[in-house]
Curated annotation (Swiss-Prot):
GO terms for biological process: negative regulation of DNA-templated transcription. Keywords: ATP-binding, DNA-binding, Metal-binding, Nucleotide-binding, Repressor, Transcription, Transcription regulation, Zinc, Zinc-finger. It comes from the Bacteria. The gene is nrdR. Negatively regulates transcription of bacterial ribonucleotide reductase nrd genes and operons by binding to NrdR-boxes. One of its GO terms (molecular function) is DNA binding. Residues 49-139 form the ATP-cone domain. Its cofactor is Zn(2+). Disulfide bonds: none annotated. Binds 1 zinc ion. This is Transcriptional repressor NrdR. A zinc finger (unnamed) spans 3-34. It comes from Actinobacillus succinogenes (strain ATCC 55618 / DSM 22257 / CCUG 43843 / 130Z).
């Protein structure tokens, strides 16, 4: 790493510590030339994969689209904006940690379903009705029964 004071390429690490719940490393460095000390922070850069639609079309991940879908499902339900943001962060983190460059849109939908199931059962059913393309009341009933069984 270059010294920010004298631009020498040689620096040595004096101290390393985990910060930000272990997602970042703080390093104290010393320049071997001018002996100035400075701090650096290292964070892994995780990329969000592209989304592959069912028709094969590929598009960049759209966080706003995800947010709108979840907000529509939780509309007029007792779910805080903070809980919605936590769910969005969790979904994004799971997508980043797949290690894949592309993921099917079904994976995103399934992750949303998992988060909504934890967040609010009515919001889960609302989202499921669109995502799973319910065509009649029997399909609604089956999904509600599955939800009831999973609560036991």
């Amino acid at each position: 790493m270059h010294c920010p004071f004298c631009s020498t390429e040689e620096t040595k690490v004096i101290d390393s510590r985990l910060v930000s719940e272990g997602y970042q490393v703080r390093r104290r460095r010393e320049c071997t030339n001018c002996h100035e000390r400075f701090t650096t922070f290292e964070t892994a850069e995780l990329v969000i994969p592209k989304i592959v639609k069912t028709d094969g079309y590929r598009e960049p991940f759209n966080e706003d689209k995800l947010r709108r879908s979840i907000q529509q499902a939780v509309g007029k339900r007792p779910v805080s904006e903070d809980d919605v943001e936590k769910s969005i962060s969790c979904i994004i983190h799971k997508l980043q940690t797949t290690g894949e460059r592309e993921v099917p849109s079904k994976l995103v939908g399934d992750l949303v379903m998992d988060e909504l199931k934890k967040l609010d059962k009515v919001a889960y059913i609302r989202f499921a009705s669109v995502y799973l393309s319910f065509e009649n009341i029997n399909e609604f009933t089956k999904e509600i029964e599955k939800l009831k069984k999973s609560q036991k």
